[in-house]
């Protein structure tokens, strides 16, 4: 793509175009553009859902409250299917379809399109169950001979087996191809991006609905752009978040697409609530302000399992875990003797790792 890369972010799996076999989408931030890059695994058919490419992933409902997590609750975030017909949907009614209603207690697969089989419908073709499909004697004989005959072509030869034992199993993603999406999906005419965001920060962050970008303007301004509204930004000023101080790091709440946490160089963390549908006016008052660090903050991360839990690291050599409902830090980890480059939760949320300038991983 054109221009120097200023940052990269991954779009959550729930926003992928699974029926096009899109397995990954990255957002590339350049000096004047936000460019989506799609990675697709080629498949002959795009009329059915390929379950081997899309295992169930973590949903957007927290597994525990902050209080339950502190009490030792080890529940994990429930997995959800990426199959379009199996995702939770809001009840839908239309005046154009009299009497249309949502049936919650329907049998599995009831009312689903043929292209989207239910969980219990896992035949080879993906369209009919074994109990309802009929085959002629000739086709059955052909199938039997194809599966048992020595020249069927389905059995691996000794040389193939030995090669597989040496190389190991091949990846289903080995033919994935990355493509820059059409310009109609780009966000262009970005202006005044911050070039001074610390190296410990990712520079910008994204969720499945929007992205947040720090600006060079005084007062730590942040612009929030809706991914559903690509195109050229106006030459005039756009609504922003007035953070009040330079941005050190920022992060979206994984369980609330409208809550943005921003760490500032004034040692405070501000929580901002984005209006439904995106920014229309400049925001000046945060939802909450977290105070506890005594020096500039390095980085912040939301907990991957429990709601309202945030961790931060600072130049004061401490790592603090915050309970957002209470608005205060409930645990302060000391022991670092040098700069903390980064920190990360384990996927199950039970462990926290930090990387430090002294070469130690804690």
Walk through the language-model features, giving the residues of each:
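WD40-repeat beta-propellers
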Residues: 1, 11, 27, 222-226, ...
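WD40/WD-repeat beta-propeller blade N-cap
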Residues: 2-3, 194-196, 241-247, 290-297, ...
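Acidic and/or Ser/Thr-rich intrinsically disordered tails and linkers
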Residues: 15-233
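Conserved strand-to-loop turn within each blade of WD40 beta-propeller repeats
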Residues: 215-217, 263-266, 312-316, 355-358
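Blade-loop segments of beta-propeller domains
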Residues: 231-260, 286-288, 295
């Amino acid at each position: 793509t054109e221009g120097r890369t200023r940052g990269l972010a991954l779009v959550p799996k729930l926003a992928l175009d699974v029926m096009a076999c899109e397995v990954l989408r990255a957002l590339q931030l350049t000096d004047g553009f936000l460019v989506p890059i799609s990675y697709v695994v080629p498949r002959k058919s795009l009329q059915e859902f390929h379950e081997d490419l899309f295992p169930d992933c973590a949903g957007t409902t927290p597994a525990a409250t902050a209080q339950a997590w502190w009490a030792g609750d080890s529940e994990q975030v429930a997995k959800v299917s990426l199959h379009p017909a199996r995702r939770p949907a809001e009840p839908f009614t239309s005046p154009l379809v009299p009497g249309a209603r949502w049936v919650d207690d329907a049998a599995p697969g009831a009312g689903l399109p043929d292209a989207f089989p239910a969980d219990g419908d896992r035949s080879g073709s993906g369209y009919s169950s074994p109990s309802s499909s009929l085959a002629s004697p000739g086709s059955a004989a052909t199938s039997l001979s194809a599966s048992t005959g020595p020249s069927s072509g389905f059995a691996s030869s000794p040389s193939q087996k030995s090669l597989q034992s040496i190389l190991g199993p091949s990846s289903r993603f080995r033919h994935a191809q990355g493509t820059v999406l059409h310009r109609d999906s780009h966000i262009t005419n970005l202006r005044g991006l911050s070039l001074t965001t610390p190296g410990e920060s990712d520079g910008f962050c994204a969720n499945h609905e929007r992205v947040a970008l720090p600006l060079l303007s005084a007062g730590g301004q942040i612009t929030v752009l809706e991914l559903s509204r690509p195109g050229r930004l106006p030459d005039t000023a756009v609504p922003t978040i007035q953070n009040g101080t330079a941005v050190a790091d920022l992060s979206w709440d994984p369980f609330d697409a409208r809550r943005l946490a921003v760490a500032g160089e004034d040692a405070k963390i501000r929580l901002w609530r984005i209006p439904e549908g995106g920014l229309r006016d400049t925001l000046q008052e945060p939802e909450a302000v977290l105070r506890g660090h005594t020096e500039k903050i390095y980085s912040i991360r939301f907990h991957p399992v429990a709601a309202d839990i945030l961790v931060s690291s600072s130049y004061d050599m401490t790592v603090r875990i915050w309970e957002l409902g209470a608005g205060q830090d409930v645990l302060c980890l000391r022991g670092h003797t040098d700069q903390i480059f980064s920190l990360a939760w384990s996927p199950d949320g039970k462990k926290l790792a930090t990387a430090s300038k002294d070469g130690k991983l804690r």
